[in-house]
Structures are given as C-alpha cells and as structure tokens.
C-alpha cells in the first residue's frame, strides 16, 4: 500500500513539476535567443504570435475572406473552376456577387440574341466522361456518387476550325476549340498531375497542352493530347550537355506526331527572366529530360543566346520551321510599345514572322519567381492584348498569325473579353491545376504541395488520382467552351470566334464607359 501511495505522490509531483520545468526551460531559451525580438521581451506567450502567423493564411482562406477578396484568385473563381470540373455545372442562384461599382470590362448584350439552333457549334462526337451527383449535403454529411455521361463537346463548327501555320509550313495545326493548357513543365508539376492533364485534355478534344520550358516528357505524351512544345532559353529537351542547341534533338522532337507546334519562350508574365526550379524538384528523371545534373537548382538564362535582336530571332524561327515542318511561335510579355514597333516593322519588311504570338500578362502564374518581378514587371493581359492586336493590324500582319492570351483567364466571361480584345486562343494554367486538385496552398516553389500537384515527391503525389482527375480536366474544358457559346449567343453572334472590340466596353469608377479603341489609343498612337 505504501508503495502505491509513494508512486502516486511521485506521479502527482511529476505532473506538476514537468510543465513547470518545461515552461522555465522555454522561458529562458526564448529570453536568451537573438532571432526574435518579441520572444526576448515576451518569452513563451510570444510564441502564440508565430503560431497565429503560421495558420493565418488558412484561417483567412476558409473563414474570414469574402468570396471576392483573395488573391491571386478569389474563392468565387476557385469554386467556379472546381465545380465545373467535378459536377460540370456553372449554375448559381439569387444574384451575382460581383461589385458592380468597381471599374471593369462588360460584354455588350444584343437586343435580339441568337437562338440555340442558330449557333455555329459542332456537337459530335459526344464525349464520354464522369461527373458527380449530390445525394445529400449538410453540416455533418456529404454524400455523392459518380455517373458516367456522354457530354456535348461544344467544338467549333467545321467551317470555323482555326488553323495555325496554314500558309507557312507543311504540317499546320488544326484546332476545334479556343481554350487550352498554358505552359507547365514536368518538374514544376509532378508526373501524376501532368498525366492527368494530358489524359483529360485528350478526352475533351479540340484543345492542346503546352509542355512549358522544362521539355517534353513521357507524361505529356501519355494521355494522347495535342502538344505545343515550348523551348525556353535553357533549351531543355533540345540541348546538348554543354548547353548548346541540338538540331538533331529538335528534329527528333518534330517527328513526334502529337507535337503540333513549337513555341519560343522569350518571357513569362510572372518572371521576365529565366525560369527557376528548386533542386529538391530536380529528380533523376527531370534531370535526364532537361540534360542537367540531378538535385541541383536550375536557373535558365534570362534570354536566348541564339539571337539578340528581331532579325536574328526571325531567322532562327524560319530555320526551326524549315527543319521541323510545323508551326513556330513566340511567347512574350508586352513592355515597351517601341520594341513591339521594332519587331513588327522587321516582320513587315522581311516577310518573316512567327505563326503565333503568345501574350502572357504580368498577372500570370509561376512555379517559382521573385516578388519584385511577379508584382511589377510587364503589362497585365487586358492592357497588353489590345495593344499587340492593334499594332499587328497597323503593320498589316494580323491575318498572318494567331494570338494566344494568358493571365488569370480561367472563367468563360474573362476568356470572352480576351477574345474580344484580340486573342484567337486562350491558355490556362492555374485553372487546370485547380481541376487536378490544387488548393491554393501557395507553396509551388517548395516541392511540398499538399495536394500532390506541384511536387515531384512520390509520397505527396499519391494524393492525386489520375483516373479520377482526368475527368475533371475534361469537364472543365467542355464547360468553358459551353460558356463561351452562351456568351456569344447573348452578344448576338453565332460563334465565340466572332468576338471583337465592339462587343466589350470598359466601365470607369464614375459610371462612364469607354470604348476599347479609345482606351488603348494613347499606347499605340
């Protein structure tokens, strides 16, 4: 009995003493450390500041921010993308949550919109995909089931199919839709994410997948999607070990049937310099594809060594097109109008030009960049796009090439505005990431993505089911195309290819409206 009493007393003393000793140890440690000022003045209790600071982003995202408040994407934009991918639905009730007092773009509606049967749309063949149906949704229970359906594809009418490189190369690219995946490299994304995207885009049809500057991987090809193969200043995928351009490797890539076009990346909206991939993401496989050393961070050159001015670049494009026999375009960020004048002037005088120009807005996404570049450098897409379109028309070049636009254009309304401002096609990256599970954790650059999307870590990637996510990608693309036809009908045109500047106005904060031509006149005069 005495032994039990002694043990009980010792246990009670331990219960009391251990927290006191632990508190004292933390107190002394905090008071003597030199890294954090708050902890030196407020030992122990000051730690709550850092705990709240750590969980603050999650609290704001899930509890405190309103539907239109967050950046780079609001809860409304995120949910619209996720719901259209999971349920293939864009329906809402009661009314818009848009703040109509703020300045912004609006689509002019027609007094007599087009009837459904008047729309120039191709609904064959049907697309076999999977959607979810909600059975019960309350505070403590959500029950839903998956259904296989045959969905309308919302392809462009055969008469409206867009052709890239029609008069310049032996193998032009025929496109039945206006929306595709923007550049995202394997290495920035994991193999499961890339595979799910490839399979989903192939299911949707009439679209494309841009490889990003990291080079072509087997995962891009795995699903069968049409590919635009991007070549950045690092020349990944088309380089020799010493970093020089390999014409043999380029020729080999150009013989792959899935590759429909090539794109030279001059710049990216979020980083108008060379790309960066942290060493933690550079696995053996990533290194092999890029022809670099594994485990070491990769920093691409800020620009191509192969050319340094418009004439040299246009000559390089001509050679790529001659060797590859496929369309070649450039990706740029609009900055100085004078530089655009110089480039387009050389195109006009020489008769040489790319088959397409991708304009990336400064608001575009990235796997890794510097704050100062992402926040400040380059023009936003809705400003840059009409400038480039207008200048191309001034130089008589607009009919000779296509324009791709990218930069937070992940809903049908924003895509329609971009088309009206001069785009022929729209690229989407982060919307595609949402459709394969991205939760906006904002840790793409760390290889610790909790959803298994922007990581090459096998343990984290197991979260992503390729077979399930491919359907969400497919549904998202179909929903975007359907939304574009809905908006076209409302604007009184029979296809979204007919959106033009006359269909859009910009409303100022004082309530007055500006026609787009007047809005951009000062930049291109």
UniProtKB/Swiss-Prot annotation:
Q: Does the keyword 4Fe-4S apply?
A: no
Keyword Transmembrane helix: yes or no? yes
Provide GO CC annotations from the record: plasma membrane
Subcellular localization: Cell membrane
Q: Which Pfam families match?
A: Glu_synthase (PF01645)
The main location is membrane
Transmembrane stretches, start-end: 4-24
Q: Which family does it belong to?
A: Belongs to the glutamate synthase family.
Q: What is this protein called?
A: Glutamate synthase large subunit-like protein YerD
Organism equals Bacillus subtilis (strain 168)
């Amino acid at each position: 009995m005495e032994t039990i009493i002694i043990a009980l007393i010792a246990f009670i003393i331990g219960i009391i003493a251990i927290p006191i000793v632990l508190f004292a140890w933390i107190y002394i440690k905090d008071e003597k450390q030199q890294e954090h000022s708050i902890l030196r003045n407020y030992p122990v209790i000051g730690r709550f500041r850092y705990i709240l600071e750590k969980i603050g982003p999650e609290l704001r995202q899930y509890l405190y921010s309103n539907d239109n408040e967050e950046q780079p994407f609001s809860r409304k934009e995120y949910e619209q993308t996720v719901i259209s991918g999971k349920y293939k639905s864009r329906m809402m009730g009661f009314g818009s949550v848009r703040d109509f007092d703020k300045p912004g773009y609006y689509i002019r509606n027609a007094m007599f919109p087009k009837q459904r049967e008047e729309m120039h749309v191709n609904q064959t063949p049907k697309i076999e995909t999977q959607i979810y149906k909600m059975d019960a949704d309350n505070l403590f229970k959500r029950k839903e089931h998956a259904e296989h359906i045959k969905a309308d594809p919302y392809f462009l009418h055969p008469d409206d199919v867009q052709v890239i490189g029609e008069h310049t190369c032996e193998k032009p690219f025929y496109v039945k839709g206006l929306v595709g995946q923007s550049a995202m490299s394997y290495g920035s994304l994991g193999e499961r994410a890339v595979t799910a995207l490839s399979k989903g885009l192939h299911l949707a049809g009439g679209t494309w997948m841009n490889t990003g500057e990291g080079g072509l991987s087997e995962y891009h090809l795995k699903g069968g999607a049409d590919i635009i193969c991007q070549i950045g200043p690092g020349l990944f995928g088309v380089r020799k070990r010493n970093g020089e351009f390999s014409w043999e490797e380029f020729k080999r890539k150009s013989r792959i049937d899935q590759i429909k076009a090539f794109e030279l990346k001059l710049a990216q909206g979020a980083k108008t310099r060379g790309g960066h991939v942290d060493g933690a993401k550079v696995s053996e496989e990533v290194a092999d594809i890029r022809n670099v050393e594994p485990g070491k961070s990769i920093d691409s050159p800020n620009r191509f060594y192969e050319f340094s001015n418009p004439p040299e670049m246009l000559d390089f494009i001509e050679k790529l097109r001659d060797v590859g026999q496929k369309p070649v375009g450039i990706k740029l960020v609009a900055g100085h109008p004078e530089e655009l004048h110089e480039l387009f002037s050389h195109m006009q005088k020489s008769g040489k030009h790319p088959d397409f120009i991708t304009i990336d807005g400064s608001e575009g996404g990235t796997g890794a960049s510097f704050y100062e570049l992402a926040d400040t450098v380059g023009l936003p897409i809705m400003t840059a796009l009409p400038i480039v379109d207008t200048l191309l028309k001034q130089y008589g070049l607009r009919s000779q090439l296509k324009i791709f636009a990218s930069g937070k254009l992940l809903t049908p309304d924003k895509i329609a505005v971009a088309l009206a401002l001069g785009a022929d096609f729209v690229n989407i990256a982060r919307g595609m990431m949402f459709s394969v599970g991205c939760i906006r954790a904002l840790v793409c650059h760390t290889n610790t993505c909790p959803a298994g999307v922007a990581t090459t870590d096998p343990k984290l990637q197991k979260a992503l089911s390729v077979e399930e996510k491919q359907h969400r990608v497919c549904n998202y693309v179909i929903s975007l195309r359907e939304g574009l036809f809905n908006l076209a009908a409302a604007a009184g045109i029979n296809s979204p290819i007919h959106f033009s500047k006359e269909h859009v106005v910009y409303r100022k904060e004082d309530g007055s409206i500006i026609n787009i031509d007047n809005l951009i006149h000062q930049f291109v005069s």
